[in-house]
Amino acid sequence: MPITKIHARQIYDSRGNPTVEVDLFTEKGVFRAAVPSGASTGVHEALELRDGDKAVHLGKGVLKAVSNINEKIAPALIAKGFDVTAQKDIDDFMMALDGSENKGNLGANAILGVSLAVAKAGAVHKGLPLYKYIAELAGTGKVVLPVPAFNVINGGSHAGNKLAMQEFMILPVGASSFAEAMRMGSEVYHHLKAEIKKRYGLDATAVGDEGGFAPNIQDNKEGLDLLNTAIDKAGYTGKISIGMDVAASEFFKDGKYDLDFKNPASDSSKWLSGEQLTELYQSFIKEYPVVSIEDAFDQDDWDNWGKFHGATSIQLVGDDLTVTNPKRIQTAIDKKSCNCLLLKVNQIGSVTESIEAAKLSRANGWGVMVSHRSGETEDTFIADLVVGLATGQIKTGAPCRSERLAKYNQLLRIEEELGADAVYAGHNFRNPQV
């Protein structure tokens, strides 16, 4: 069934910045998708097209991307008469229409908006829930409910505190279902709030971009200690593991790592070498139930990535390192730099390429963690994506803020719909199909 109309508009994300929304029309109705955007972005990401007029939205308007959809992509796609279920053909056509390596002409945010809407329409035309349609597109065997990695303490570029490392996450690996994982996450979150209030005062319980708390602490171990205490008070010691997103590219300076990077008068004699930072991570792993570290080093510090990967058995996630880009992923595979892909649909800019990135990673023994961005919308596509790709893990913020809960609540609905067929990844989150 062909696409009859495509209309894009500028809406706002969870940080109050403009973003792209697309309505795609077929005989069966209207299918809507909204595009997220990140705060800490890798230099190798596909290009998010912004207007650049500093007098309007501080340069962050997306009317160029909207116009590219309405005036270029829409007429070209409709003229071709593609069936809405031809996801790969449509995505390939849009990439050819753009003609650049990084989607810089039309904008990755323009192409992705249409790509997401096409997938939603394709599912309805096939008479399938979106997660089952994605599983069909990807050739997935059995669908799997993911372990949620709740980002409950925010630092780095996501918060105004002194904490250098960006995300401190809890993973309810010992839950028996996604619903139980949500309960665990929610309870720990509330115990954490009470503990932060007790230690640092009520004003320390304000939340960051992704719903996590941002107490004004500087020592990263203090963050881990807070998590351990909250997990213990909730009664889940041994059932909940810890994950971190260090976002080290944000504080990489002159070949070293500055854990006081938010201080303009930071003492360069205290900056850490890659080796010293590795030692710090090893101490985290030894002292706390840390099972996953993301972006442990700068996005081009291949040497330290490789050394750490060779010296640890935990999950090492590439985000800024790999930017969901098959070429970067292949380089990381060849260099043995990490063992898990952070999959962000807007880093690569289409559904087809997202599926291909996940398949390439899995074929080489990696895990895959599906991820939101810090600037999110109420769109729930990634909830269906993580189930359809059966990757076993998702991070989409704390159990707080509606744009985060929208995804978690969709996962609850999917688990309910699957009934007795629902499988929760649990301890097998790194390789749920084994």
From Swiss-Prot:
Q: What domain of life does the UniProt record list for this protein's source?
A: Eukaryota
EC number in record: 4.2.1.11
Q: Which Gene3D superfamilies match?
A: Enolase-like C-terminal domain, Enolase-like, N-terminal domain
Q: In which pathway does it act?
A: Carbohydrate degradation; glycolysis; pyruvate from D-glyceraldehyde 3-phosphate: step 4/5
Q: Which PANTHER family match?
A: ENOLASE
Taxonomic lineage is: Eukaryota, Metazoa, Ecdysozoa, Nematoda, Chromadorea
Predominant location category: cytoplasm
Q: Which SUPFAM superfamilies match?
A: Enolase C-terminal domain-like, Enolase N-terminal domain-like
- Give the keywords, sorted: Cytoplasm, Glycolysis, Lyase, Magnesium, Metal-binding
Instruction: Give the UniProt subcellular location, in the record's own words.
Output: Cytoplasm
GO cellular component annotations of the record: cytoplasm; phosphopyruvate hydratase complex
Q: Oligomeric state and partners?
A: Homodimer.
What residues does Mg(2+) bind to?
D245, E294, D319
Record-linked SMART domains = Enolase_C, Enolase_N
BP terms from Gene Ontology: glycolytic process
**Which NCBIfam families has this protein been placed in?**
eno (TIGR01060)
Top EC category: lyase
Family matches, as Pfam families: Enolase_C (PF00113), Enolase_N (PF03952)
Q: Which residues form the active site?
A: E210 (proton donor), K344 (proton acceptor)
Query: What is the official name of this protein in its record?
Result: Enolase
Q: Which cofactor does it need?
A: Mg(2+)
UniProt keyword annotation of Cytoplasm present: yes
Q: Looking at the keywords, is Flavoprotein present?
A: no
